[in-house]
Amino acid sequence: MKYKGMTCSSGSPAFTHLVANEDSFVAERLRRAGAVCMGSTNTPPMMASGMHRGLYGRAESPYNPEYLTAAFSSGSSNGSATSTAASFAAFGIGSETVSSGRSPASNNALVAYTGSRDVISPRGVWPLYPTCDVIVPQTRTVDDMLQVLDILAVKDPREQENFWAAQKHIRIEPVERPDSFPDLSLDSEDSLRGKRLAVPKMFIGGHDPQAKPTFVSEDVIGLWKTARETLEACGATVIETDFPLVSRYEDDSQSGHANNVQGFQPDWNGKERGELVAYLWDDFLKANGDPNYPDLASADGSQMFPRPSDYIPDRYMEQKNFMDYPGLVERARKRQGESIWEIEGIADALPALEAQRKRDLEDWMANLGVDGVVFPANGDVGRADLEQNDASAQHALQNGVKYSNGNRALRHMGVPTVSTTMGFLDGKDMPCNLTFAAGHGRDWQLLRFARAFEMATGRRRKPPVTPDLPTDGIEVKLTEGKGVRQGYSPPKLRLMEPHLDGRTLRLSGTAGLSGDGADVEISVFVDGKSTVAERDDFAWSVVTDFERFVPAKPLYGGYSVHVGKVNVVVIARGEGGVAAQHLSISPEA
């Protein structure tokens, strides 16, 4: 996702130093609303899987590091979800092509929203499969989600850069925006009363002869039974059903492909994963205008998604889903100016996707007389050691575990969903979400359903790996007994060159108001720990020991540029405001 001036590598070594020329639609809206971007988060290369290691590695679970923080095959927004769960930020913004937003939200006890077509513009976000791609806000509560959507769910004035808004092959019914998203919470506790909800048997350990086998652990079945009781206590009727939206889509006996969409031209699946991706990546790079990465044809395809040979998880992944990255570069070289709208088959594909959702979801719901579909977000969680443990890899790559439930069908056909915490798995201390889904345009009803369930349960809990710290609280204060005074300027804060001697760190600097430091309060934090600063008029100094963190060497990929460094934050408070500086110091310096 582009944030002007920051790198936007999409987790790929092929684009390490790619710098965004402007804000994405999402970043633009959030910045205008006063939000502060804390940073970009981890994703696998090109967002094309879940827990493969990208340029900066992968996120690890703040609930239980023995388990993955997202599904292995589709959970690319794992960094966004993990940082939000751990309260690094108030909320996160992910994206999803299969289950890349829903999956890490479930493994991190977060609310996830995947909207109907064109509710949140994806402009400025690296595309993967634009027919599937959707922006996924991730929050700790439904109320937080409503606040975020109040900012993001608006029309993009540059809609020609938004795939579904720009296409001319089928009319997408607009989703009417409520006057106020926060007002959707009003009386939402009763929103499930009198509603009929369908739960697909395949996702709760039942039998659906039309569906592919789906793994569901006893822990998840137990959580579902409790969730069902809660839904019924809220006044809903729950019926067990089939789920043709998924089972028909995944019937590869007809298409021979990973999906079966009636109306696709025979070779469309190859073009959707070939020319369409290549041309969109090419367009993205050209529009960004970084001279070091002018277009896709100049990229190194072999470095887009590198991983070791004989990589254990690859033994159990669907080979038909692997992308030919050097082949995409070659397609861009041979493009000869062809537009994505000139790719043969696209005019049939888009109406076919909309028609299949209407038939297999919306008409099916109408025939059953149900108001929504509800199901556990996943059948189990994968173990973190699957790169070294064959049994862990086999388990993590089963249907029901490798993706969020619903797999690619939900995204390919633009099904809106809202997920919220269902509870925690016994013995694993890992969360699992409950997902609400419905037809196009039913988004706001789903948000109310999720809030009613959340209010009735309150099952989310804080992650134990990142507990509350005294420094987590943001105290609004200046110098003792004083507020910001009119006509006063913030302190002038200066840091000198730090010195490291073994495990001892020496810092010094100055802070003052017009040369006088008497009225300035200095706070120094070394790796999050408060450290006492010695004062001498406007000069200050710190001498402290630190514990050097040496990260484990990953099997492949990298890790954050700040990992293994000493991080220092210095804050100066005066009568005219606050000044702060941050240092990231290498122990070898």
Segments predicted by a language model, with ranges:
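Short glycine/serine-rich loop/turn segments
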Residues: 1-133, 166, 200-202, 206-210, ...
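Short helix-loop capping/hinge segments that flank enzyme active sites or metal/cofactor-binding pockets
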Residues: 1-13, 191-209, 258-359, 376, ...
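Stable alpha-helical elements in mature extracytoplasmic
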Residues: 22-26, 76-79, 144, 148, ...
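Structural helix-boundary/capping segments
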Residues: 28, 32, 86-206, 213, ...
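Acidic carboxylate-rich catalytic motifs and surrounding loops in phosphoryl-/glycosyl-chemistry enzymes
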Residues: 41-42, 237-249, 421-423
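Charged, often glycine-rich, active-site loop that binds/positions anionic groups
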Residues: 50-57, 248-275, 387
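A glycine-rich phosphate-binding loop feature that marks nucleotide/adenosyl-phosphate handling sites
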Residues: 165-170, 244-251, 371, 377-380, ...
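An extended, acidic, His-containing surface patch that forms the Zn2+-binding/catalytic region
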Residues: 336-412
